[in-house]
Structures are given as structure tokens and as C-alpha cells.
UniProtKB/Swiss-Prot annotation:
Coiled coil: none annotated. This is Recombination protein RecR. Residues 81-176 form the Toprim domain. One of its GO terms (biological process) is DNA recombination.
Amino acid sequence: MQTSPLLTQLMEALRCLPGVGPKSAQRMAFTLLQRDRSGGMRLAQALTRAMSEIGHCADCRTFTEQEVCNICSNPRRQENGQICVVESPADIYAIEQTGQFSGRYFVLMGHLSPLDGIGPDDIGLDRLEQRLAEEKITEVILATNPTVEGEATANYIAELCAQYGVEASRIAHGVPVGGELEMVDGTTLSHSLAGRHKIRF
């Protein structure tokens, strides 16, 4: 069936979103064109600005349009002395919604995976080590996902913390093994943060 090249292009572009297949992309495209063109324009403008203006925080590596994000630049957060290490910026949103953590973060943008060629420097551990050496950090809370790779990454970081005399703790189990942190409900995540345990070598 022959369709508008622009319509086909729009549907193909929408398929880059997670969980969006051909049918979902088609439904989205027709909805925007048929019922909500102004919403489509707002979406296009927001996407264009986000893609061109959002970068990474110089301290924690999360997404921000500033050099340093609002959390890292907050004096009360700086005085806290705790850093929570997570795998993705989405994990920060999940933890912030619990209201249980008042420190700062460090985003790995992934996890260690030697089979995929992902080493310590690829997930910013050189920057984390620099922060451990230069800043007054009292505790690093390891909130990587409870997967094999996440556990290996947490253990590697715990060893790094030990070299600088910084206490390392792991969030308590309760987060489903093999799950993704951003998908966990707030109550479970609150219990996990409150019941974190120290990692000793």
C-alpha cells in the first residue's frame, strides 16, 4: 500500500521509542495528525530542544541543560556527604520520589560488562574515583540493579571506596532480582534504601 512518505517517516521515527511497534507507531501518528496537531507541534519542539540542549552534569553525569544539575549544586545536598550510585538517570527519579534520600548521586549510564567490552572508564568510574579523592564523602550507597552485572559493578565500586577509606553500603534486597530499579514501586524502594547494608572486604 502506498502512503505519504512523510507519514511513513513519522511512523518509523516513533518506533525508536521503547515498546512501540508498527501498530502503536501507526496509531500515534494518526492520532497526532487527526486530532492533536498542536500537541504534535509541542512534542516536536520539546524533542528538538531536549536533543540539542540537554547534556550531562559535570559532577554526577545525569541529564541536565546546566553545567551542574540542581541536585549537585544544592548546598544542603553537598553537606550530606552521601553519594548514591545508580545505573541510569531514570533511577534518580525513582529514588527521589521516595523522599528517603537527601544526598547526591553518581550516574554510571550502564554497568560493567567485560563480555561487551564495557570497562570501568566506560561507565565513568575514573570520575567517581576523582570525587572520592577530592570531596568529603562519608558514604557511597550502591543502588545498581540487582542483576549479575549490577552486583559485579557494586563490588568493584566498593573496593574502590575501600582504597579511599570511604564507607560503602548496598541497598537492601526487596528490589526484585533481575529487575530494573526504575520499575520498582516507591514503598519497596523506600524499604530497600532504609535497610541498606555495608559491604566489607
